[in-house]
C-alpha cells in the first residue's frame, strides 16, 4: 500500500485526505469532468480521477464500460468533448498523441502491437525514438554523436530488458517469443519512452496463472524501480485486488465507485452492477 489514503464522496471524486508526512504529495495525472460522445451518445461521462505520483491504480468494469476509451482520451487518441486532463499540472488540451507521450504518458494495448519482424531490442529502441538527441544530418552522415547516442540507447535498452530477464533474447525476432514474453516486451517498449504514468490495458490477458503472478511482481518492480505511477485496466480481479492501491469502477461510461481494494470488494453497487450479484448476496468482489 502507498503511504497515503484515498477517500471519495459522491460530489468530489478528486478529494484526498493525506497524513501530515504527505503534505508534499502531488498528482501525476488529473482527469477533470472528462466526457466524450460518439453519435450523440456518451461513451465516457464526467470522468474524474486523480492518480498519485507512484500510485498503482486500477480501472475496472464490464466489457463496453468505456475503460479503453478513457485510455484513448488520456493519450489523445480521442479528443474529449468536455473536461480536461492535467499531466504534472500541465493541461494537455491541444496536444497530439506524440506530445502527450513526450509529456510522460505511455501505454500498452489490449492486442499486442509489436513490430514482430524486428528484433526484441529494436522494438525497445523504437520506444526511445522520441528521446534521441541527434539531428538528421548527424544520423545521415553517421557522425560520432550519432554512434555515441546509439550506444547509449542500446545499453539502456538492454538494462530495461534485464529487469524482465529478457536480455538474452535481445536479438531474437519479437514474433518468435511466447505470448507472455511478447506482453512483457510491450511493457518494456513503453518504459523506454521514460514515462511518469504507465497505462496498461489488460496486461494479463491470455496469461496463465504463473505468468500472471510474475506480472504482478514485475508491476511492483516497475513502480519501485522507476518511481512512476501505473494505471491498469484488468478483468483478473485477483491481480487488481492484489496490487492496486486505489480502484475506480466504470459502468456505462460513468464511475460508480472508487476506493481501496477492500472498499471495492465489499461495495454493494460494484457487486450488483459489475459482478451481476444482488446486494443481498454475500459473495464479495474478490471471490468472483
Regions found by a protein language model. Give the residues of each.
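Glycine-rich phosphate-binding loops of nucleotide-dependent enzymes
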Residues: 2-288
Amino acid at each position: 500500500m502507498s503511504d497515503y489514503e484515498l477517500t471519495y464522496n459522491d460530489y468530489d471524486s478528486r478529494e484526498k485526505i493525506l497524513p501530515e508526512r504527505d503534505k508534499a504529495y502531488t498528482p501525476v495525472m488529473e482527469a477533470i469532468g472528462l466526457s466524450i460522445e460518439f453519435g450523440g451518445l456518451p461513451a465516457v461521462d464526467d470522468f474524474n480521477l486523480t492518480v498519485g505520483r507512484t500510485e498503482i491504480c486500477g480501472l475496472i468494469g464490464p466489457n463496453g464500460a468505456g475503460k479503453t476509451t478513457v485510455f484513448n482520451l488520456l493519450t489523445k487518441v480521442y479528443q474529449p468533448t468536455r473536461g480536461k486532463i492535467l499531466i504534472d499540472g500541465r493541461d494537455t488540451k491541444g496536444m497530439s498523441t506524440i506530445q502527450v507521450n513526450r509529456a510522460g504518458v505511455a501505454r500498452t494495448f489490449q492486442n499486442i502491437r509489436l513490430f514482430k519482424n524486428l528484433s526484441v531490442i529494436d522494438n525497445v529502441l523504437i520506444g526511445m525514438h522520441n528521446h534521441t538527441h541527434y539531428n538528421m544530418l548527424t544520423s545521415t552522415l553517421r557522425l560520432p554523436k550519432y554512434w555515441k547516442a546509439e550506444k547509449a540507447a542500446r545499453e539502456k535498452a538492454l538494462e530495461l530488458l534485464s529487469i524482465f530477464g529478457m536480455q538474452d533474447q535481445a536479438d531474437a525476432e519479437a514474433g518468435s517469443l511466447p505470448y507472455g514474453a511478447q506482453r512483457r516486451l510491450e511493457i518494456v517498449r513503453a518504459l523506454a519512452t521514460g514515462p511518469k504514468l504507465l497505462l496498461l490495458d489488460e496486461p494479463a490477458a491470455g496469461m496463465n496463472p504463473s505468468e500472471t503472478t510474475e506480472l504482478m511482481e514485475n508491476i511492483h518492480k516497475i513502480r519501485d524501480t522507476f518511481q512512476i505511477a501505473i494505471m491498469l485496466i484488468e478483468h483478473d480481479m485477483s491481480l487488481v485486488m492484489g496490487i492496486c492501491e486505489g480502484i475506480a469502477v466504470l459502468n456505462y461510461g460513468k464511475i460508480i465507485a472508487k476506493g481501496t481494494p477492500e472498499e471495492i470488494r465489499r461495495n454493494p453497487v460494484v457487486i450488483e452492477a459489475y459482478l451481476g450479484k444482488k446486494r443481498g448476496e454475500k459473495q464479495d468482489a474478490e471471490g468472483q
